[in-house]
Amino acid sequence: MQFDYIIIGAGSAGNVLATRLTEDPNTSVLLLEAGGPDYRFDFRTQMPAALAFPLQGKRYNWAYETEPEPFMNNRRMECGRGKGLGGSSLINGMCYIRGNALDLDNWAQEPGLENWSYLDCLPYYRKAETRDMGENDYHGGDGPVSVTTSKPGVNPLFEAMIEAGVQAGYPRTDDLNGYQQEGFGPMDRTVTPQGRRASTARGYLDQAKSRPNLTIRTHAMTDHIIFDGKRAVGVEWLEGDSTIPTRATANKEVLLCAGAIASPQILQRSGVGNAELLAEFDIPLVHELPGVGENLQDHLEMYLQYECKEPVSLYPALQWWNQPKIGAEWLFGGTGVGASNHFEAGGFIRSREEFAWPNIQYHFLPVAINYNGSNAVKEHGFQCHVGSMRSPSRGHVRIKSRDPHQHPAILFNYMSHEQDWQEFRDAIRITREIMHQPALDQYRGREISPGVECQTDEQLDEFVRNHAETAFHPCGTCKMGYDEMSVVDGEGRVHGLEGLRVVDASIMPQIITGNLNATTIMIGEKIADMIRGQEALPRSTAGYFVANGMPVRAKK
């Protein structure tokens, strides 16, 4: 089998590339996905409110676990990644957050990455998006990804939580993806007008999958990339339960889009990476790149949970006898409780003046429950997810064998710097202050977790060690740049090799201030134009907020 391009991984970036490259009818593309189709009749991936379900099994989740995390009481921590058409956009929380403009301006400070500034990238965010409120300087009106805004009157807790943040002295922002990210406001979501999850399989592949020049293979587990000298010329994979490899050749390029955990694994199995690691598994060295699998970053978060004094939380929706009605309303009308991910309010703040842009993120949820649906509190409640955004902690992803089915060694080194501990202590104390503003007085009952007895630095640190969880935002393991630990250049091309790019969250040099999905899609759109040799979209002239030493919050 011969194709112009072979794309490994039908996720948030791979589906963008498959769709854009096949717009040229003379370009043939093979898209390989280790998971299955995104079954449209499966409410677990299609109903926004069911977002916890795909994380509980292994049909749609790789369900990786970390090595014992040394600064987290040696816990082995969850590292869920999407499996199936759509990748992690098939199982994520559907929060459409782009990050802060200064994240990208910070990337663009690196020599060779100048065209990754916010104003260079904004046109590609807009190209990908159809926002239900229409287009403007910041938002698109006819892109493949449906973005839904929060509507007034959904749940009184959302507005009360935003108002509480404002009462605590922080800014209000009408659009976390617009002129000003800093502050509290409504949160956009990747949900269609029909109340369905807007994964990249739905948004992108639906328009491309009938094209004769696109071949999609699901249940295709990539074993390794085939090289001729320093040139990538094809891919070998295992289909279904078969142990006999299938191979195809790429006339132009192999595009690795398997995500921050799998992309470095595939490079390592293919002979690209740290020479000592590859020698350990007798993998012939194709090209030494010590940065492959290093620079692993993530967002860590924790929940502050409160009893709700009024019966306005989502607690009744957790009762089995209410679920048939909720399901029917969603299935036939695309409305009701099932049509939202219920992360409809949030915010970004600076915890201290030393941060030039927000370093703490909030997601508000009108029910007290773990992200994966476990440990639901048996009463009306609400919670605040809070975590730091740009931890200095760095980890790694390293293969444990040549077997593509074996999970790698993943270590994030969460909380390995003093800055991490200071940020979490600040975050918990600021959150408590916000939760005790007048706007929440009528709703706020007792603090369920961590509990009022948890007050000292030592007590807060111990709570974080035992209870903080991943926000499922791994990135950085094939970082873009030109230093000795970089893996790809500013166009995603792997250093020292030909015909091979990495295009996914692994190429982010530094983690962004917010959820990763929107930016991963943007990366796919931007590099698709580079691959096609098209001129970049004209740089935006939109304005954006920079704090420039402004006080963190208004004095009361």
From Swiss-Prot:
Involved in the biosynthesis of the osmoprotectant glycine betaine. Catalyzes the oxidation of choline to betaine aldehyde and betaine aldehyde to glycine betaine at the same rate. This is Oxygen-dependent choline dehydrogenase. Belongs to the GMC oxidoreductase family. Activated by high osmotic strength. GO terms for biological process: glycine betaine biosynthetic process from choline; response to osmotic stress. Pathway: Amine and polyamine biosynthesis; betaine biosynthesis via choline pathway; betaine aldehyde from choline (cytochrome c reductase route): step 1/1. Keywords: Cell membrane, FAD, Flavoprotein, Membrane, NAD, Oxidoreductase, Stress response. It comes from Escherichia coli (strain K12). Its cofactor is FAD. It is found in: Cell membrane. The lineage of its organism: Bacteria, Pseudomonadati, Pseudomonadota, Gammaproteobacteria, Enterobacterales. The active site is at residue 473. Optimum pH is 7.5 for choline dehydrogenase and is between 7.5 and 9.5 for glycine betaine-aldehyde dehydrogenase. FAD binds at residues 4-33. It catalyses: choline + A = betaine aldehyde + AH2; betaine aldehyde + NAD(+) + H2O = glycine betaine + NADH + 2 H(+). Disruption phenotype: Cells lacking this gene do not grow at high osmotic strength in the presence of choline, but are able to grow when the medium is supplemented with glycine betaine. It is a peripheral membrane protein. Its main location: membrane. Its EC number is 1.1.99.1, 1.2.1.8. Induction: By osmotic stress. Choline is required for full expression. Oxygen and choline exert their control via the transacting DNA-binding proteins ArcA and BetI, respectively. One of its GO terms (molecular function) is flavin adenine dinucleotide binding. GO terms for cellular component: membrane; plasma membrane.
